[in-house]
């Protein structure tokens, strides 16, 4: 039977789901209708639409996950149900994170201005580079899934035996293996974060350089390019902030679940973990002029 704490958690989880679904469905519908009307799909719209679809899939998994944890948390520790849910959540989370990273890289090359030949060469081949990043993310997904499967097997094995007395050497060996696997998973998560961080740093350098050039030419410090720089920086920095919250919440959730799996407060760590897919869509809407204007007209 659900406790009062479970009911509060489920109400918050459902509210988080509905709000985020509205944002992502809106992004998908606007971009699809624009693509049909113009008979052309721009790279930014394609990435945004793919990100919205991926996030919708992740939100559905999160909702099922929330009901499972809130109403029948004991089923989460079974191989038949717990393992597929964790694997599916990881896949959708991986795709969402990498698509958001590709969007950050796209904004950087689309908006920033550097005279360096390497930057110009990469900018000219931007679509191909985004495709290469997506291919890299698929290879990393295969690697991560293999590591995660071993991680889950060991973790559920520990939970299954938690009521028994494990030999000290056996217990130490299992936890050592978990530490190594968690490190590998954290390292692969660091790749999209570092790419987005690099994008926002170079966007800032480009903005400083552009503003200095405007002042030297007596044109002031505000023009369309400056505003584009600032909007892109706000979106990428917001993504980085949400990604940091998401990443550390994931580490805390792993620790609580696999070390103290029946702790009642893991539910609220999950709400913080889901802040990234829940809030990111509205940041994208506010930062994209087409989406923002459409939203204003609807309101």
UniProtKB/Swiss-Prot annotation:
PANTHER family: TASTE RECEPTOR TYPE 2, TASTE RECEPTOR TYPE 2 MEMBER 42
PROSITE patterns: G_PROTEIN_RECEP_F1_2 (PS50262)
GO molecular function: bitter taste receptor activity; G protein-coupled receptor activity
Bilayer-crossing regions: 8-28, 51-71, 102-122, 128-148, 188-208, 239-259, 266-286
Membrane topology of the entry: Multi-pass membrane protein
Record's miscellaneous remark: Most taste cells may be activated by a limited number of bitter compounds; individual taste cells can discriminate among bitter stimuli.
GO cellular component: membrane; plasma membrane
UniProt KW keywords: G-protein coupled receptor, Membrane, Receptor, Sensory transduction, Taste, Transducer, Transmembrane, Transmembrane helix
SUPFAM superfamilies, per database record: Family A G protein-coupled receptor-like
Predominant location category: membrane
Gene3D superfamilies in the cross-refs: Rhodopsin 7-helix transmembrane proteins
Record's function text: Receptor that may play a role in the perception of bitterness and is gustducin-linked. May play a role in sensing the chemical composition of the gastrointestinal content. The activity of this receptor may stimulate alpha gustducin, mediate PLC-beta-2 activation and lead to the gating of TRPM5.
Entry protein name: Taste receptor type 2 member 42
Organism: Gorilla gorilla gorilla
Family the entry assigns: Belongs to the G-protein coupled receptor T2R family.
Topological region Cytoplasmic: 29-50, 123-127, 209-238, 287-299
